[in-house]
Curated annotation (Swiss-Prot):
Catalytic activity: 1-(5-phospho-beta-D-ribosyl)-5'-AMP + H2O = 1-(5-phospho-beta-D-ribosyl)-5-[(5-phospho-beta-D-ribosylamino)methylideneamino]imidazole-4-carboxamide
Entry's transmembrane regions: none
Quaternary structure, from the entry: Homodimer.
Residues bound to Mg(2+): D85, D87, D89
An example Gene Ontology CC term for this record: cytoplasm
Cell compartment(s), UniProt: Cytoplasm
Protein name (Swiss-Prot/TrEMBL): Phosphoribosyl-AMP cyclohydrolase
Amino acid sequence: MDLDTKEIIKNMDLKFRNIDGKKLLLAISTDKDRNILMTAFMNEESLEKSIETGFMHYYSTSRNKLWRKGEESGNVQKIIDVFRDCDGDALLFTVEQTGWACHEGYMSCFHNKIDLNTGKFTVVGNKLD
């Protein structure tokens, strides 16, 4: 017997943190080779939508709303696996990425390498077409 989404989330024993007055947790998405694609926040509703649809949904703290990854660009993230960290306040999602993950056109949002001697950064990733 399959459980409903709320019961699944309850069984995950997550610790949503109070961030800007919202109950959120960190979501990290990687490809199947564990290359980090992006990080974002999730609230309970975005986690529910992700579980129900099989595609990543996040909570935007700047826009104060739920969003489905790729809703405008078509660059969706299909969920393959999910892992809970030891504290229960972060989730790691393995996803099948369509197109690029970064809104700037890079596969990963982590394409700026920082020089710790100067604090300046250099773009190390290539933009995708």
